A protein has these predicted regions:
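Hydrophobic alpha-helical segments that drive targeting, anchoring, or assembly
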Residues: 71-72, 80-93
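Alpha-helical interface subdomain recognition
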Residues: 1-77, 203-359
């Protein structure tokens, strides 16, 4: 796998080797059937990978956001059925940003924040009533983090899952996306700094899914090349047929496009902003996922639809992730509003300068 600029190669090489050992097709399949992947998570957690990019004084593993995003790319590449993004890049980030210590176990977050909750405040405690939908791995979480805005202040509210009613649900890939009901649940609320709010949380969620999708598209493209070179039809590998080659090219170019977009957005976010690049990258990855899954399934034919072959673990994750933290319509509309706000003379500087122009 190619090296990413600005990322510690020791981290990525170790993560890649680990996933190669613990995330084979059978393990991923069993995780979907059983609704949990305890052994995979435990092996992942023992290395400290979930908490990369979180300062050690809060219980993190140190490192940069770029390191964490590269690990997420590998999670997507290997279709690892674990809450890596929620525990570190999202939930862990909210906890550390509000000065709270990270727990040793799984952390999850409400993707929609407090949007669907009735919130009442009493000092540094909040009472939450309502329902959170499609909460990743809520059933396995030690803490549920809810980003909440009360008046002009944004808080990271922490909830004990035992105080909630959790209904197990899954996404298209069989990953836990549970329903969490809050019935006057007490939550501790720690204030977040001004640069961490519901909007920046939304962007960071989109960035996490972009990294995951970039990895999955890359692996899907590689599987397609390998399979079509091995599969012989009419006396030669099917990869020699022009129609199949066209599908392989589409898969490869979308893999390169998604990874380039994810890395660009990650670098800008690591510098402290990157809103324009993240929105662009999520839209690019969403569209690349749609094209690549079609092309790669076409290249595989019937084999790609079987349970025994791993392609579906990737394509079903892509179909699920592309809807999380903003679909095409949301990010396309956001980019359109930003472009219009810059006026005709500001369009080219926006394209070439990105978020730096918006400051």
């Amino acid at each position: 796998m190619s090296e990413t600029f600005g990322v510690d190669s020791l981290i990525t090489d170790t993560a890649d080797r680990l996933f190669s050992q613990i995330c084979d097709h059978e393990s991923v399949q069993n995780a979907e059937l059983n609704g949990e992947a305890t052994e995979i998570w435990n092996a992942f957690a023992e290395t400290g990978f979930p908490w990369i990019s979180i300062d050690e004084k809060f219980g993190g593993s140190g490192g940069t956001l770029l390191d964490a995003l590269e690990v997420l790319r590998l999670v997507g590449y290997h279709a690892a059925p674990i809450p890596a993004a929620e525990t570190g890049v999202l939930g862990g980030w909210l906890l550390a940003s509000s000065g709270q210590q990270l727990p040793e176990g799984v952390v999850t977050v409400l993707p929609s924040g407090s949007e669907d909750l009735l919130v009442t405040r009493n000092g540094d405690h909040l009472t939450l009533t309502g329902r959170g939908l499609r909460v990743p791995w809520a059933r396995a979480a030690e803490i549920i983090v809810v980003p909440i805005q009360v008046e002009e202040q944004t808080f990271a509210a922490t909830v004990d899952p035992d105080d909630c009613q959790i209904t197990p649900m899954t996404n298209m890939a069989g990953e836990p996306r549970d329903t969490v009901d809050f019935n006057q649940v007490e939550a501790f609320a720690a204030p977040l700094p001004s640069d961490v709010n519901l909007q920046t949380f939304r962007f960071r969620g989109a960035l996490s899914r972009t990294a995951l999708m970039a990895g999955a598209i890359e692996k899907m493209s590689q599987l397609s090349v390998s399979y079509t070179n091995d599969r012989v039809q009419f006396g030669r590998p099917v990869a020699k047929f022009q129609a199949v080659q066209q599908h392989l090219v589409w898969g490869a170019q979308d893999a390169a496009l998604a990874r380039m977009a994810a890395e660009t957005a990650g670098r800008e976010a690591n510098r402290g902003d990157g809103a324009f690049e993240i929105a662009s990258a999520k839209l690019i990855a969403n569209q690349a996922a749609a094209r690549a899954t079609k092309a790669c399934h076409q290249a595989h034919g019937a084999m790609g639809m079987t349970q025994e072959y791993p392609l579906h673990h990737l394509s079903r994750r892509l179909w699920s992730w592309r809807k999380e933290y903003g679909g095409d319509a949301e990010w396309g509309a956001w980019l359109g509003r930003v472009a219009v706000s810059q006026g005709a003379d500001g369009l080219y500087p926006l394209i070439t300068g990105g978020s730096a122009v918006l400051k």
